Regions:
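Mid-domain alpha/beta scaffold segments of enzyme catalytic cores
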Residues: 1-260
Length: 260
């Protein structure tokens, strides 16, 4: 069985409280042997740590998500630094970023948390997991100011030019359920022709289900559907795509090889 890696799963979310262990088992049965779990708020960090300690193949990232701005306090940035110091098994800082789609999120506050988390990641040599909705140009500008920073823009929804600018900076893009919808023509075109070394696959569970799972809670076991779609778009072998994207995730997040 090919070892798939879900590079972005919120398996710690409340939607999985009733069947989290079963969801993990279904993922493993589907070949998803590793998952990267980014957090969204400081209150989530202890439970995420407990989950990733208890279950093999789950790797934590800690950060402050822009959509949950009302749950953050400036002190959480200091807390994040202390938390990272105390938890060396952390694979990334995130999920963090900018969201200019939701009008009730203060842009200035978002920028403050975002910039601080980029600096924290850069200082520690950790990659970042980025949320960028209607904010990619500003995110790109922030990344250019921090040469050497590594990471991924998850659920990429930008233009081909923005994708190339990310690749020029060494950043990867995360692709999930949206690519399975025929209406996503721009995204599908980018994925079809992009350099494979910059591609990560994700489910963003419990959100963003694929077209065959529309309206249902998404979960990591759906990742093979993403693999199949992307392989078809690229006229590529699914096994080769699975191996290449898993290798990309292991390289970015310094994950062990879970095929053994």
């Amino acid at each position: 069985m090919r070892a798939l890696i879900d590079s972005h799963s919120h398996l710690d979310a409340g939607e999985f409280d009733a069947d989290r262990d079963e969801a993990i088992a279904r993922a493993r049965a589907a070949g998803v042997l590793a998952q990267v779990l980014p957090s969204v708020a400081a209150a989530d960090w202890p439970a995420l740590h407990a989950l990733t300690t208890r279950q093999r193949g789950l790797y934590p990232a800690y950060g402050l998500h822009p959509v949950y701005l009302d749950q953050h306090a400036r002190a959480h940035l200091d807390d994040l630094q202390h938390w990272l110091d105390a938890h060396p098994q952390t694979v990334a800082v995130g999920e963090c970023g900018l969201d200019f789609h939701l009008s009730d999120l203060d842009p200035g506050l978002q920028r403050m948390y975002f910039d601080a988390q980029l600096d924290i990641a850069l200082q520690r040599g950790l990659p970042v997991i980025l949320h960028a909705r209607r904010a990619l140009d500003e995110v790109l500008a922030a990344l250019r100011r921090r040469p050497g920073l590594r990471g991924v823009v998850h659920s990429f929804s930008g233009s081909a030019q923005q994708a190339r600018q990310l690749w020029d900076l060494g950043f990867l893009i995360g692709i999930g359920g949206p690519v399975t919808y025929p209406r996503a023509q721009r995204l599908r075109g980018i994925v079809a022709g992009m350099p494979i070394e910059f591609l990560l696959l994700e489910t963003d569970s419990p959100d963003q289900p694929d077209s065959d799972w529309r309206g249902q809670r998404n979960e990591p076991s759906r990742l093979p559907r993403i693999v199949a779609e992307v392989a078809a778009l690229r006229c590529a072998d699914t096994g080769h795509l699975a191996d290449a994207t898993a290798a990309n995730a292991r390289r970015l997040f310094a994950l062990p090889d879970d095929r053994v």
